[in-house]
C-alpha cells in the first residue's frame, strides 16, 4: 500500500505528506488544526486504511484505526474513537482488496424480524435499530477445507475429498484459532495492514451483510413458498445431507455466496436477547450461562425457514463441540 496525498494530523497540527518518485520527501510543513484525522484525496469509491502513531519516524509504529471508502474525491476522516492528543499522527494508505473479500461500509439497519414474518422464531424480537460505525471486509465465501488446512495443517471435516467444500466440524475455538493464526501469518507477510485482524463477524455484522440492504425474509425477497430458495441455498430439500463446494449458488446482492444455507456459520457473540431500541456496534452479552455461541445462516440439513436472514440459532462453545453442518466465514477489520 502506498500513501497517496495524505494529511498526517498531530493533535492540533496537520503534517502534509505527499508520495514522491524514488521515495524522496521534503521537510514536512505544519498548519494548525482542531481535529485528529486525515484528509484523503482519491477516486470516489476507493478504499483506504487510516493509520495512526505517536512516532511517525518509527516505521513499525503505525497501527490501523479504520478502513474508509471515499464517498467523494476529497474526504475528511476524523477519528472520534478517543479524544485528540498532541502526540497522534495520521496517514491514509490506498487499500488493495483482499482476495475474495467484499468491503462493507458503515451503516444503520434494522436487525431481527417483524412479528408477522412467516416461519419466524420468538428470539428474533424485538427488532433493533443497529448502527455499525466502522467499515470492514468480509469473505465472499465460507472458509473452505483447502484454506483451513493451509492455515492450520488439519481438516476435521467429515466430507473430505474436495478442498472447495466449506470447512465443517469445527468448534468455536477452532474457528477463532484459525482467525488468529491467519492474522499472524498475513501480518508477517505484509499482506494486511498493521493493526488489522481476521476474526469472526459479530451477529449484527452477519445479519447486515446477509440482508444486503433488504428487509425481506431473504436477501432476494420474501419468497413465501420457497420457490426461489434453491437458486441461492443448499438446505434440507436439495442438499442431499452433505456440504457442497462454495459458490455454486447465486450470491446475495452484495456478492456473498452461501450466506443462506450450506453450513451454519459461527459468529463472535454469546447468545442473548436482542436489546431493542437503538444500539451502536453491539457485541452481544458478556457471557452465556449455558455456554451458547450464536450461529447463523442455516445448513444443508435444516429447513428452508432456517435459511432466513433473521434466523438466530446457537451451539455450544467448547473445544470438543462441533457439527458436520457448522463452519464459518471471516471478517478483516481494524480493532
Predicted segments — roles?
Residues 97-157, 170-173, 260-261, 330:
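A short glycine-rich, aromatic-capped structural motif
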Residues 80-83, 169, 248:
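Short, flexible loop/turn segments at beta-strand junctions in immunoglobulin-like
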Residues 117-130, 214, 222-224, 239-242, ...:
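Surface-exposed recognition segments
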Amino acid at each position: 500500500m502506498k500513501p497517496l496525498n495524505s494529511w498526517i494530523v498531530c493533535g492540533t497540527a496537520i503534517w502534509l505528506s505527499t508520495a514522491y518518485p524514488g521515495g524522496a520527501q521534503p521537510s514536512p510543513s505544519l498548519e494548525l488544526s482542531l481535529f485528529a484525522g486525515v484528509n484523503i484525496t482519491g477516486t470516489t469509491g476507493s478504499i483506504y486504511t487510516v493509520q495512526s502513531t505517536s512516532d511517525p519516524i518509527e516505521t513499525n509504529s503505525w497501527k490501523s484505526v479504520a478502513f474508509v471508502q471515499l464517498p467523494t474525491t476529497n474526504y475528511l476522516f476524523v477519528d472520534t474513537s478517543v479524544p485528540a492528543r498532541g502526540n497522534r499522527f495520521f496517514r491514509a494508505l490506498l487499500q488493495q482488496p483482499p482476495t475474495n473479500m467484499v468491503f462493507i461500509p458503515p451503516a444503520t439497519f434494522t436487525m431481527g424480524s417483524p412479528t408477522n414474518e412467516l416461519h419466524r422464531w420468538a428470539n428474533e424480537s424485538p427488532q433493533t435499530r443497529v448502527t455499525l460505525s466502522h467499515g470492514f471486509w468480509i469473505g465472499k465465501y465460507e472458509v473452505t477445507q483447502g484454506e483451513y488446512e493451509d492455515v492450520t495443517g488439519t481438516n476435521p471435516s467429515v466430507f473430505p475429498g474436495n478442498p472447495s467444500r466449506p470447512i465443517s466440524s469445527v468448534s468455536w475455538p477452532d474457528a477463532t484459532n484459525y482467525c488468529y493464526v491467519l492474522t499472524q501469518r498475513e501480518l508477517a507477510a505484509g499482506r494486511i495492514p498493521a493493526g488489522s485482524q481476521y476474526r469472526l463477524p459479530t451477529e449484527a455484522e452477519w445479519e447486515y451483510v446477509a440482508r444486503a440492504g433488504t428487509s425481506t425474509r431473504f436477501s432476494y425477497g420474501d419468497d413465501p413458498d420457497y420457490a426461489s430458495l434453491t437458486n441461492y441455498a443448499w438446505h434440507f430439500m436439495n442438499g442431499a445431507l452433505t456440504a457442497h463446494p462454495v459458490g455454486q449458488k447465486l450470491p446475495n446482492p452484495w456478492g456473498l455466496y452461501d450466506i443462506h444455507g450450506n453450513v451454519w456459520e459461527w459468529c463472535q457473540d454469546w447468545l442473548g436477547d436482542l436489546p431493542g431500541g437503538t444500539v451502536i456496534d453491539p457485541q452481544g452479552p458478556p457471557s452465556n450461562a449455558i455456554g451458547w455461541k450464536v450461529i447463523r445462516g442455516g445448513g444443508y440439513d435444516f429447513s428452508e425457514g432456517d435459511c432466513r436472514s433473521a434466523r438466530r440459532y446457537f451451539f455450544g462453545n467448547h473445544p470438543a463441540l462441533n457439527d458436520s453442518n457448522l463452519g464459518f466465514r471471516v471478517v478483516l477489520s481494524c480493532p
